[in-house]
Amino acid sequence: EVTKPETINYRTLKPEMDGLFCERIFGPAKDWECHCGKYKRVRYKGIVCERCGVEVTESKVRRHRMGYIKLAAPVTHVWYLKGIPSYMSIILDMPLRDVEQIVYFNAYVVLDPGNAQNLSYKQLLTEDQWLEIEEQIYGEDSELLGIEVGIGAEAVKRLLEEVDKTSEAEKLRSEIANCKGQKRAKLIKRLRVIDNFVATGSR
């Protein structure tokens, strides 16, 4: 995990530890040399320095090793939203246009319809519609309970968390066995994506 905004130390010209170029995370800046210089040369290949925690290997590993930054709020990754096919809309079983409306703060989404008869799960609402419902919820003689509505990446995160991938995959398999044509192809595409998530243990 990258925890510091620093890149390179201006005096030593070496990458800062836990920074954006950290050698412990991404690998050594120089071939076969750890950060503190205790291990140098190929003969120490594969050793992790006990002082600085850097693995003695080739510097080219820095090109493909990945780190991560813990964000303060959820953010929607454009690859999963805009990629073809859009994995986000496939998993949520929603049209891409609807998912974009939520992500770009153009529409609210119903996360829990509560006891409201005119609302359904994943239904999109305009700002005016939501304000109208809010007035009804907080009205004096209101009987509306348990209604939850969200917007932005936080709402999308909640919807994704609520997808039970294992049971969804089983449900899709039984549906695929009983349908044909374009609907079957669409279900197979969705099952493939969900199966990949289950196989890799991704959340």
From Swiss-Prot:
GO terms of molecular function: DNA binding; DNA-directed RNA polymerase activity; metal ion binding
Cofactors, names only: Zn(2+)
Residue numbers binding Zn(2+): 34, 36, 49, 52
Main enzyme class: transferase
Catalytic activity, reaction form: RNA(n) + a ribonucleoside 5'-triphosphate = RNA(n+1) + diphosphate
GO cellular component, one term: DNA-directed RNA polymerase complex
Keywords: DNA-directed RNA polymerase, Metal-binding, Nucleotidyltransferase, Transcription, Transferase, Zinc
The protein's name in its UniProt record: DNA-directed RNA polymerase subunit gamma
GO biological process, one term: DNA-templated transcription
